[in-house]
């Protein structure tokens, strides 16, 4: 991920038009969701094939899964090499990113706000795995129903990713982000208020799928924020790396916190404490989106700002040459 992820984000920005950033990142994340939904059952087949071929040993099955994903990775790399070619022009020295540019990016307020929005959204990414155990252990939902719900998430993902991208381009990225954070927080609170019996199962499933839909609306839009904040495409890779460093920090502590709370306080108490933390982080995400909206208004930024800023920057040297 060190070099791969920033390259992906920059490629999507460069290949998409200023008016279609939301749709572009929505299709990007949606396609990843479809690929995941396809590859997961294939990986299970590879695992079973390995076990059957070697006396039903788990190690043999895992070996086949590793080989399967390795082949997919190599194939994807060759596909990129074939389809995504450079135009042959050399990068001008003025366009090359230097260590000075890294410092410039770090001083951009937009980078830190986007990073904090991503941080709050990623807390939910790591927390989503605890909803199904809550349903099965406390609401009486069957394990089979829990497995079906977990599988259904994979098919909600591409629909919400792509749909969210179109809605963002129509109504505004920051507005949709704010709505999504609030819906996720309210939905999580509603789940905590459900009676602890099997009569709540259907409501739980419906509310969870609504929450998950809006979470996947949010996920690609955090990257579309770069265009609103006038972050130059030239430094997109650097910006994505810094945003990811900030935004993915929950990876360090969320799972540990969940384990400590849920195991340390058996029953509903641990889940209430952890989901309470999650609600607080979602509301904090909404606050950061409001800060973002004020930042955009203060600086006269918004949809297509990056393209406008770069066009103005490119026009200045041309005007000087013409005057000379």
Residues covered by each model-derived region:
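A membrane-interface helix-boundary motif in multi-pass transporters
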Residues: 48-70, 260-282
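Glycine-rich segments within core transmembrane alpha-helices of 12-TM secondary carriers
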Residues: 23-48, 244-255
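Helix-to-loop junctions at the C-terminal end of transmembrane segments
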Residues: 159-173, 262-263
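Extracytoplasmic gate region of multi-pass secondary transporters
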Residues: 36, 109-161, 219, 254-255
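Juxtamembrane intracellular "pre-TM" segments in multi-pass secondary transporters
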Residues: 86-114, 311
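A late C-terminal transmembrane helix in Major Facilitator Superfamily
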Residues: 230-266
């Amino acid at each position: 991920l060190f070099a791969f992820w920033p390259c992906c984000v920059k490629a999507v920005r460069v290949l998409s038009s200023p008016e279609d950033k939301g749709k572009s990142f929505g299709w990007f994340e949606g396609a990843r969701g479809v690929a995941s939904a396809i590859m997961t059952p294939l990986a299970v087949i590879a695992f079973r094939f390995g076990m059957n071929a070697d006396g039903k040993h788990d190690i043999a099955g895992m070996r086949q899964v590793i080989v399967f994903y390795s082949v997919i990775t190599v194939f994807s790399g060759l596909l990129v090499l074939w389809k995504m070619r450079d135009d042959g022009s050399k990068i001008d020295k003025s366009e090359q990113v230097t260590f000075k540019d890294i410092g410039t990016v770090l001083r951009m307020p937009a980078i830190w706000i986007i990073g904090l929005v991503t941080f709050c959204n990623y807390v939910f990414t790591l927390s989503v795995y605890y909803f199904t155990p809550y349903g099965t252990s406390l609401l009486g939902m069957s394990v089979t129903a829990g497995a079906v719900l977990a599988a259904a998430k994979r098919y909600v993902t591409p629909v919400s990713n792509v749909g969210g991208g179109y809605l963002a381009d129509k109504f505004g990225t920051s507005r949709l982000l704010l709505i999504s954070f609030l819906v996720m927080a309210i939905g999580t609170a509603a789940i905590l208020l459900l009676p602890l019996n099997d009569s709540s199962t259907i409501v739980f499933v419906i509310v969870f799928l609504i929450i998950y839909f809006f979470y996947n609306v949010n996920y690609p839009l955090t990257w579309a924020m770069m265009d609103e904040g006038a972050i130059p495409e030239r430094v997109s890779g650097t910006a994505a790396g810094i945003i990811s460093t900030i935004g993915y920090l929950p990876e360090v502590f969320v799972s540990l916190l969940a384990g400590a709370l849920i195991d340390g306080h058996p029953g509903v108490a641990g889940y209430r404490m952890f989901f309470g933390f999650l609600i607080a982080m979602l509301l904090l995400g909404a606050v950061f989106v409001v800060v973002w909206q004020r930042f955009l208004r203060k600086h006269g930024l918004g949809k297509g700002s990056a393209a406008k800023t770069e066009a103005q920057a490119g026009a200045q040297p041309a005007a000087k040459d013409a005057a000379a």
